[in-house]
């Protein structure tokens, strides 16, 4: 069957000139053909993500058209403004895919608001809400290597699409022939017909105003003398991040020249992920990923070296800074709420408790943090939300968008650094003070990759075996509790393919398949009297679980 589909593509008059040579090159190679055509990229709550190329299991204009027709069919049942917002990052073909999606929507009579240049995830989420759209599309593969691209879908609240909506869109995609089933007009035709319009300056200004309103100590940075080295990792963060930092008074910004301008090949950093040290090894301090929803920093240590701050550590530092600062300034709301994912550090729970903040723990995926904001909004209590984070370098400190935002993350990190500098301290010193107060937590993530067509089956088999044969001990420590998030009646959260093992010494191990990549991730949390003890515990646990996950 996949050979028939391959032959159909080979015979078709394809508009993308890059696809024909690829199809010709793999002729007669059953393994290569099967990899491209045996399955289709699956549309889920995170949309699509895959390697660029020809076939149903690749990202190309035909797969984008098919997905967008499915989305359009759903939008047409939703009433409202019949409008979709679109943005895109610097990845290869992101602009082409964005305009392709706009053409499909316009052909279906759906209005489009698209950014006139690349803009990040938070800008897309904001525009979706600002224009009261039915949906939003962000063309990006986030932090994946350069050969990938993707398509994130958002609901009318600016949050990533719900399970129910994504299931309907997926069903509509299944009804749409990938090569011929989508309605389509050119981008120029859509503009001429008045169906496609660019996002206005009023929307961009409103976004910047909303971000800057969340400063904890407004005006501090104008006199702090903070010097910053910044890299947008050749992505979409350059304009919004520097705009906000300049507005708040940080003007001494050195941009890493090799990583300043959009470049989908990411030639200086093959894996443009701000949690990978390669992205920060040029001696810089701050980096945002290509779609600017995540931000990482390297802080300067007393000996002049740089140390990468983990996503968990930065989440705790920002929570601590926001709480202390808002209490000091009298801007802390009554009954404040913070939100984090279940795989993020329990140190944040201890910090929240210290400041009298309710900490809510949700499933992995920032949409669940957005869901908590929506619940507060529905109750007329959205001002209670002060901060949300995930260990994977995603932060949000306001309800103006419903996805992680590296722009506000960058702003608050810089403000925090400026504040500690102004009192003769540093981010590094404050982190050590937090550990001294609450205990030396260590949080580490390991990943096990399962490539190829059989990868997903292998992952499913491993997860099922862990449920059929529950672990009773790890590294000589008894497992005192197994929490299976596939049992919502026990967790109080929606069902998810996550297992958490709590050990007798207080350590935890979380095992979950990645939602976007063929990986099983393990999250280790250990607590020791010092870093060496916590690291030794983690190493022992990692060694014990590795053979189980291979």
Regions found by a protein language model. Name each.
Residues 32-37, 41, 149-279:
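Gly/Ser/Thr-enriched, mixed-charge loops and adjacent short helices
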Residues 282-284, 288, 305-307, 325-512, ...:
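Phosphate-binding and adjacent anionic-ligand microenvironments
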Residues 85-148, 244-295:
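N-terminal small/polar loop signature for handling phosphorylated ligands or for N-terminal nucleophile
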Residues 96-105, 148-154, 241, 293-311, ...:
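Short Gly/Thr/Asp-enriched flexible loops that form oxyanion-binding sites at enzyme active sites
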Residues 37-57, 141-142, 228, 232-244, ...:
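Conserved phosphate/anionic-ligand binding catalytic regions in large, soluble enzymes, centered on
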Residues 116-177, 275-287, 292, 316-322, ...:
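Phosphate/diphosphate-binding loops
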Residues 6-101, 190-191, 195-224, 236:
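An N-terminal, well-structured beta->alpha segment
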């Amino acid at each position: 069957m996949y050979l028939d589909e391959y032959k159909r593509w080979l015979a078709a008059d394809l508009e993308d000139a890059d696809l024909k040579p690829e199809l010709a090159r793999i002729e007669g190679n059953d393994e290569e053909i099967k990899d491209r055509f045996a399955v289709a990229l699956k549309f889920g709550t995170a949309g699509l993500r895959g390697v660029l190329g020809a076939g149903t299991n690749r990202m190309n204009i035909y797969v984008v058209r098919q997905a967008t027709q499915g989305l359009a069919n759903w939008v047409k049942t939703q009433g409202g403004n019949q409008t979709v917002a679109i943005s895109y990052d610097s990845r290869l073909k992101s602009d082409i895919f964005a305009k392709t999606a706009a053409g499909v929507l316009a052909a279906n009579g759906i209005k489009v608001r698209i950014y006139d240049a690349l803009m990040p995830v938070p800008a897309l989420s904001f525009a979706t809400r600002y224009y009261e759209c039915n949906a939003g599309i962000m063309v990006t593969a986030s932090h994946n290597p350069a050969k990938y691209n993707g398509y994130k879908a958002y609901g009318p609240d600016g949050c990533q699409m719900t399970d129910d909506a994504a299931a309907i869109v997926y069903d509509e995609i299944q009804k749409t022939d990938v090569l011929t089933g989508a309605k389509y007009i050119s981008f120029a035709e859509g503009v001429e017909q008045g169906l496609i319009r660019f996002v206005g300056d009023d929307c961009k200004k409103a976004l910047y105003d909303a971000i800057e309103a969340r400063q904890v100590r407004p005006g501090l940075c104008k006199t702090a003398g903070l010097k910053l080295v910044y890299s947008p990792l050749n992505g979409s963060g350059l304009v919004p991040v520097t705009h906000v930092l300049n507005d708040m008074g940080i003007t001494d910004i050195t941009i890493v020249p090799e990583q300043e301008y959009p470049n989908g090949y990411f030639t200086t950093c093959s894996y443009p992920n701000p949690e990978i040290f390669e992205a920060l090894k040029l001696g810089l301090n701050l980096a945002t990923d290509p779609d600017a929803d995540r931000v990482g920093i390297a802080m300067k240590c007393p000996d002049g070296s740089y140390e990468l701050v983990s996503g968990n550590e930065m989440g705790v530092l920002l929570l601590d800074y926001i709480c202390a600062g808002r209490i000091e300034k009298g801007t802390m709301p009554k009954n404040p709420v913070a939100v984090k994912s279940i795989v993020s550090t329990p140190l944040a729970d201890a910090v929240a408790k210290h400041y009298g903040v309710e900490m809510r723990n949700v499933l992995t995926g920032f949409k669940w943090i957005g869901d908590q904001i929506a619940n507060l909004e529905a109750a007329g209590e959205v001002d209670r939300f002060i901060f949300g984070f995930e260990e994977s370098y995603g932060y949000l400190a306001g309800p103006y968008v419903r996805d992680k935002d590296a722009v506000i993350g960058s702003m608050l990190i810089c403000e925090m650094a400026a504040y500690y500098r102004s009192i003769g301290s540093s981010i590094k010193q404050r982190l050590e003070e937090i550990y001294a107060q609450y205990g030396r937590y260590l949080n580490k993530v390991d990943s096990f990759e399962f490539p190829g067509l059989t990868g997903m089956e292998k992952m499913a088999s491993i997860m099922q075996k862990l449920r059929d044969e529950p672990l009773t001990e790890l590294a000589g420590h008894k497992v005192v509790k197994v929490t299976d998030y596939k049992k919502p009646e026990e967790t109080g959260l929606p069902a998810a393919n996550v297992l958490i093992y709590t050990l007798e010494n207080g350590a935890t191990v979380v095992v979950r398949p990645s939602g976007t990549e063929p990986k099983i991730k393990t999250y280790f949390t250990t607590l020791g009297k010092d870093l060496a003890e916590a690291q030794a515990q983690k190493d022992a646990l990692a060694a014990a679980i590795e053979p189980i996950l291979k």
